[in-house]
Amino acid sequence: MDKSKRLFLKSKRFFRRRLPPIQSGDRIDYKNMSLISRFISEQGKILSRRVNRLTLKQQRLITIAIKQARILSSLPFINNEKKQFEKSELTATRTTTVFKTKKR
């Protein structure tokens, strides 16, 4: 190679491959809640394939398993635990203020 052409070649940078989120021994099944819960957002939505870093086949199987778990009511359709807790706090504070004003 000429000396002028060698100057333009970049050295390849080393990068570390991440481990796949689903190991070969893991079964994608609606009963495997520990596996399924990793692929659901805080709101209860199914995370996208780009976020999960899954293959197309794995993402399809995960989606089917999540939908089966929702239908069999082992998984909620929407996760509103935070909102319910906040609402109960608000009603508790409102009732205490109502009682305080009535005592006068």
UniProtKB/Swiss-Prot annotation:
Pfam families: Ribosomal_S18 (PF01084). It is found in: Plastid, Chloroplast. The keyword Transmembrane does not apply. Keywords: Chloroplast, Plastid, Ribonucleoprotein, Ribosomal protein, RNA-binding, rRNA-binding. GO terms for biological process: translation. GO terms for molecular function: small ribosomal subunit rRNA binding; structural constituent of ribosome. InterPro entries: Ribosomal_bS18, Ribosomal_bS18_CS, Ribosomal_bS18_sf. Disulfide bonds: none annotated. The keyword Chloroplast applies. GO terms for cellular component: chloroplast; mitochondrial small ribosomal subunit. Gene3D superfamilies: Ribosomal protein S18. Belongs to the bacterial ribosomal protein bS18 family. Part of the 30S ribosomal subunit. This is Small ribosomal subunit protein bS18c. It comes from Lotus japonicus (Lotus corniculatus var. japonicus).
